[in-house]
């Protein structure tokens, strides 16, 4: 147990998908790597990059989501997840979508935090929701979570109501944090919210100068994957030459990951996807433009300036080209 870091020092985040109280069951080790990002912001991509460095090659000892589990996800018994991690002899790397203020902050651990243009993350989440078997998710959730802590089904009015992308994006843009930090289990609606994304990135931004916190961005991966892999190696203290980084990066392209989707996509052993390959849909940028009218685009810029400071917004939308977090 993490008795040195009581939960009172952290914000509670609990939903159908995740419960950050589960972190208290894991004893962290010197050298552990925790990868944190909002949904559909490049977390799986970063896991793959870290795996290439930890194992010095493309081969994995098991499915990536078993080797590098989403520890707070509520569909696997925490005892099983912790037992798997405790048995690992290699350097451990663990996935989370919990904001940094909800995690155990340990000087011995490296925190790799990833961002993406929130609009692109929302589009990707829209397609992922269509690929997810929600009934299977609920069955797995109810098999693990005690009855008194389970999420109630969605309100009856929401059942059977097919929402248009326009409706989804309007709610995404205007909605608050879901769930608000610090409250109990909450039913999440739709594809999350813009406020969720910028809140999570904000918890990283104010801690970005800590020596064991490093920021990476989806746009920077797209621009120079080998260069970002080399930078990641340096952050983690793993020896790698530029030529070796270039060789390894070929195994982390979208096509390469899609070709091994049963190994690389998350939760492939849990049966929650209609298609593992569709998890790696396109990986592009700018698809949000088909869902935004000029008025919605203007509203978006008004909204983001309510939610975050200019330097964070520049990085969140463009990576280091927009603003270097080292500043």
Swiss-Prot record:
Keywords, alphabetical: Transferase
Active-site residue numbers: 97 (proton acceptor)
Keyword Transferase found: yes
UniProt cross-references to SUPFAM superfamilies, sorted A to Z: P-loop containing nucleoside triphosphate hydrolases
Any one GO molecular-function label of the UniProt entry: sulfotransferase activity
Annotated binding of 3'-phosphoadenylyl sulfate, by residue: 40-45, 116-124
Enzyme class: transferase
Family stated for the protein in its record: Belongs to the sulfotransferase 1 family.
Biological role stated in the UniProt entry: Involved in the synthesis of cell wall sulfolipids.
Name of this protein: Glycolipid sulfotransferase BCG_1434
Organism: Mycobacterium bovis (strain BCG / Pasteur 1173P2)
Lineage, opening ranks: Bacteria, Bacillati, Actinomycetota, Actinomycetes, Mycobacteriales
């Amino acid at each position: 147990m993490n008795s040195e870091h009581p939960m009172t020092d952290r914000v509670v985040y609990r939903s159908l998908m995740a419960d950050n109280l589960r972190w208290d069951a894991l004893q962290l080790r010197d050298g552990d790597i925790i990868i944190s990002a909002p949904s559909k912001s490049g977390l799986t991509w970063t896991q793959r990059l870290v795996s290439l460095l930890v194992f010095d090659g493309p081969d994995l000892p098991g499915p990536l989501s078993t080797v590098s589990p989403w520890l707070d996800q509520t569909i696997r018994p925490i005892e099983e997840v912790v037992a798997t991690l405790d048995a690992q002899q290699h350097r451990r790397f663990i996935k989370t979508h919990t904001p940094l203020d909800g995690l155990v902050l340990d000087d011995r651990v490296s925190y790799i935090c990833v961002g993406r243009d929130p609009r692109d993350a929302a589009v990707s989440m829209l397609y992922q929701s269509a690929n997810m078997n929600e009934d299977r998710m609920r069955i797995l959730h109810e098999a693990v979570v005690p009855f008194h802590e389970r999420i109630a089904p969605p309100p009856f009015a929401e059942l059977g109501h097919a929402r248009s992308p326009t409706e989804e994006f309007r709610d995404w843009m205007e909605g608050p944090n879901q769930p608000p930090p610090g409250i109990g289990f909450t039913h999440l609606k739709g594809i999350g919210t813009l406020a969720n994304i910028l809140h999570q990135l904000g918890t990283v931004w104010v801690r970005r100068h800590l020596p064991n916190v490093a920021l990476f961005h989806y746009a920077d991966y797209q621009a120079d994957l080998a260069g970002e892999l080399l930078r990641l190696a340096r952050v983690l203290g793993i020896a790698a030459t530029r030529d070796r980084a270039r060789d390894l990066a070929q195994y982390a392209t979208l096509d390469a990951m899609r070709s091994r989707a049963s190994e690389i996509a998350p939760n492939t052993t849990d049966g929650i996807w209609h298609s593992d390959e569709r998890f790696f849909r396109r990986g592009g940028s700018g698809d949000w433009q088909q869902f935004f009218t000029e008025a919605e685009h203007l509203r978006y810029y008004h909204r983001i300036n309510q939610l975050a400071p200019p330097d964070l917004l520049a990085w969140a939308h463009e990576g280091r080209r927009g603003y270097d977090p080292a500043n």
